[in-house]
C-alpha cells in the first residue's frame, strides 16, 4: 500500500535528540507512538531495505506522515510516550485496557461505623482499605469480616429505620447497635480490631482478644469470655489459611508469560506481607511485538494510569528483566514523586511469590491458547459448511426478550475469531410497538443497528437471528434496504428451535434463499452457533429483567398521587426495596424524609389496596 510518504526527505529534518514520534495513516489517525534516545537513528531503522518484522512492514506501509516531539531526556520521552498512547490508543501499540476503578473496603466515621464495598471517588469521610484486585475479593473479605467482627454492613438509611434487630443479629453477624443491643465502648472496640485486621495486623488482634478473654474469665464473665474464645479460634483459622510473609511489606509481584501473540501479566497484590488478591491482565499485543516492548508498555500504562485509583507500592517484583528497566523506574518515580523500584533477581519469600505468579501467568496463557485453537477450529468448520470465499472475522446475533409484551429488550452480541467480543455488545430498549409483537421488535432493533452503516463501519460477515422464518424475513428486508448502496452485506442465518426445543435439533435458514439445513448435534460448527445464540439470549433476558424491575418499581409507586421520582427514590433507599415499602406500617413510612403522616397513609392505602 503506497501512502506517498517520502522517508528520505523526512529523515533529513530529524535531529539526534531524545523524543517521541507519532505515525499517522492517510485518514489522519495515529497508528503508532514510539520514543527514542536518538530519534534520527530510531526512525531511520523503519526505512531500511530489509525489514524482518512483519508488524514493522505493515506499519511502514500505512505511514502517511510523522510528527516528532523533542524532550529533555529519555525519562521525559517515556512519560510523554505513555500519555500519547493513552490519548490515541494506536492500533500498532501494546494497549492495556484497564479502565475500571479498583474496589476498596470502606469503614465509615459514623457513631456506629459500618463496613461497606466501595468503588469510585473517595468522597465520604472514613477509612479505605485496599485496593482489592476485583469486586469478588472485596465481597469475599466482607463476608469473612461478618463472621469475625459483629460490625454492621447496612447503609445509614436502613440503620436509622430499624426498630428491632435484623436477621444479621440473629445470625451473630452484627451486634445491632441500631437498637442498643451493644454499648458504644464494646462496638468501638470491635471496630478497632476490625481495622487492625484489615491492615494485616492479625497477631496484634489475637493478642488483644486473648487479653480480653483472660480478663473476662477472671471477672467470671464466662459467656463473654467464650465469645472472645470463639473469635480467637476463627481468626487463627483464617491466619493459617492465608499465605503470609513477615518481612515483605507492600509490593506487587508480577509473573509474565508471552506466547503465540498472547501476553498475560499475573499480579499478586501483597500488602503487609499478605496476598490481598490476584488478577490477570491481557494487554492487546500487535502481531510479532517483541517482549521488551510488551513489558515496558504494560508497566508504564499500569502504574501511570491516573484515571484508576490504585495504591502503588514502592516495590515491584517481576519475572523478566528488560533493557529499559532502570529508565522506566526513574520515569515512574518522577511521575509519582515517590520512590519506586523494580526487581527481577529475588530470594526467599519474594522468590516464592514470584514462582506462584509466573505459574499462574503460564497456565492462563496455555488455557487461552487452547480456547483460541478450539474457537478457531469451529470458525474454520463453519466457513467450510457455509462455503464462504473469505474467513469470518465478525459475527453478530440478535434476540428479543419480554414477559407478555412488557419491557421488551433486543440484544446484539458480537463474536470474533477469539470468541465473544463483549465490548461490542449492545442492547436496544424497544418502544412504540404493540406489546408482544416480536416481528416489530426485531425490525426496530435491526433498523437501529444499521441505521447509519457505511462501508467503513463494522459490518458482520454473518448475522444470526434467534427465531423462525418470520423474524428472519423482517431482518433480511431491513438489511436489504440498509445495504443497497454498499458492496458488502452480512449473510443472514435464522436459528429456529426444533419442535422439542432441545439443543442439537436447531434448523438453520439462509435469509436470502430461505433454504434450510441442519447440522449433526456433535458438530463443532453447530456448537459455535449455539454459543453465540445462547449468549445473545442471556444478554437479552438480563437486560429485560433489569428493565422490567426498574419499570415495576417506578410505576407502582409513581402511580400514587404525590409520589414523584425523588420521593420514590427516598422510599426505596430508606426502606430497602419495593417489597419492604409494601410491608411497611404507616409509622415506618412516615419516618422516610419528605413523607408526611398523611402521605404515609396514602401510600399505605394504595399499596395495600
UniProtKB/Swiss-Prot annotation:
UniProt entry keywords in alphabetical sequence: Cytoplasm, DNA damage, DNA excision, DNA repair, Excision nuclease, SOS response
Keyword field contains Acyltransferase: no
Positions of the GIY-YIG domain: 16-94
Pfam hit, one: UvrC_RNaseH_dom
InterPro entries: GIY-YIG_endonuc, GIY-YIG_endonuc_sf, GIY-YIG_UvrC_Cho, Hlx-hairpin-Hlx_DNA-bd_motif, RuvA_2-like, UVR_dom, UVR_dom_sf, UvrABC_protein_C
Gene3D superfamilies on file: 5' to 3' exonuclease, C-terminal subdomain (1.10.150.20), GIY-YIG endonuclease (3.40.1440.10), UVR domain (4.10.860.10), UvrC, RNAse H endonuclease domain (3.30.420.340)
Residue ranges of domain UVR in the record: 203-238
GO cellular component, one term: cytoplasm
Subcellular location, record wording: Cytoplasm
GO biological process, any: nucleotide-excision repair
Gene Ontology MF terms: DNA binding; excinuclease ABC activity
Origin superkingdom: Bacteria
Oligomeric and partner information: Interacts with UvrB in an incision complex.
Family listed: Belongs to the UvrC family.
NCBIfam families, per database record: PRK00558.1-5, uvrC
Job of this protein: The UvrABC repair system catalyzes the recognition and processing of DNA lesions. UvrC both incises the 5' and 3' sides of the lesion. The N-terminal half is responsible for the 3' incision and the C-terminal half is responsible for the 5' incision.
Name the record gives this protein: UvrABC system protein C
